[in-house]
């Protein structure tokens, strides 16, 4: 069994050594331009077209939760990956717990009005503020996949009213489910906090725009943990300036790194992190990949395969 590996920033040698220990029967090598030798599996992140084109692979593993970079390249270069080759993504591998930490910490930050107290501190102003009531602080999760379900589970501990919106209806205990475009307005109408965990597909690009933001309650909050292309940044800035949106915590952006001239940097109601909400945990990723390859070799059914038409 031959495995090729490519990641533009990971410690390639570490990955190769750990993969060799986890899959001792495999010959694992770092892919370099010009390497056209045979391979059974490819482990990749933002791979060059040349790496995958024309190969008779058993499977490709994207080393992250999103596969939009591969799918966008496939649109421009359909020869990059044969339709018969299954594409897998890392559904969790430690990222779910990181998303839980990020989401819960920020929701509590807003619920306890720490954002307001920070602004008061900046002007040396001492003024206790009325508390928010938990029953009025509904959390809405856009996107009800693996990571969305993890975030919902963690927020249930804090007894916030929860709702989710997705393409198809979900049956999550304690979470009100909305499905389809026809139910999006009803979903948004009660969301004091909107957490975006949607996949990046043509149908979701620019979905968080003026029209969507206007359907939120006045003074709502936005937490974007998915992709920058989901948000029309000018529309968000306008909503922040008008007070329609009271605050935004943004981990992802249309352009990354976020340009220094972006007005988001200096906005008093925006908090920025550099795409770190959930980072691939190497040890857990290797465990998932090695188990999945073993299942594929035995002809067993596996989880995490991407539906290329849907984009996730």
UniProtKB/Swiss-Prot annotation:
Similarity field: Belongs to the D-isomer specific 2-hydroxyacid dehydrogenase family. GhrA subfamily.
Q: What is this protein called?
A: Glyoxylate/hydroxypyruvate reductase A
Entry's HAMAP family? Answer: 2_Hacid_dh_C_GhrA
Q: Which organism is it from?
A: Escherichia coli O7:K1 (strain IAI39 / ExPEC)
> Where found, per UniProt?
Cytoplasm
Determine if NAD is one of this entry's keywords: yes
UniProt xrefs under InterPro entries: D-isomer_DH_CS, D-isomer_DH_NAD-bd, GhrA_Enterobacterales, NAD(P)-bd_dom_sf
Q: Which SUPFAM superfamilies match?
A: NAD(P)-binding Rossmann-fold domains
Q: Where is the active site?
A: 227, 275 (proton donor)
What is the enzyme's class at the highest EC level?
Answer: oxidoreductase
State any GO CC term: cytosol
Q: Which GO terms describe its molecular function?
A: glyoxylate reductase (NADPH) activity; hydroxypyruvate reductase (NADH) activity; hydroxypyruvate reductase (NADPH) activity; NAD binding
Report the PROSITE patterns cross-referenced here. D_2_HYDROXYACID_DH_3
- Main location group: cytoplasm
Q: State its role.
A: Catalyzes the NADPH-dependent reduction of glyoxylate and hydroxypyruvate into glycolate and glycerate, respectively.
Catalyses which reaction(s): glycolate + NADP(+) = glyoxylate + NADPH + H(+); (R)-glycerate + NAD(+) = 3-hydroxypyruvate + NADH + H(+); (R)-glycerate + NADP(+) = 3-hydroxypyruvate + NADPH + H(+)
Q: State the EC number(s).
A: 1.1.1.79, 1.1.1.81
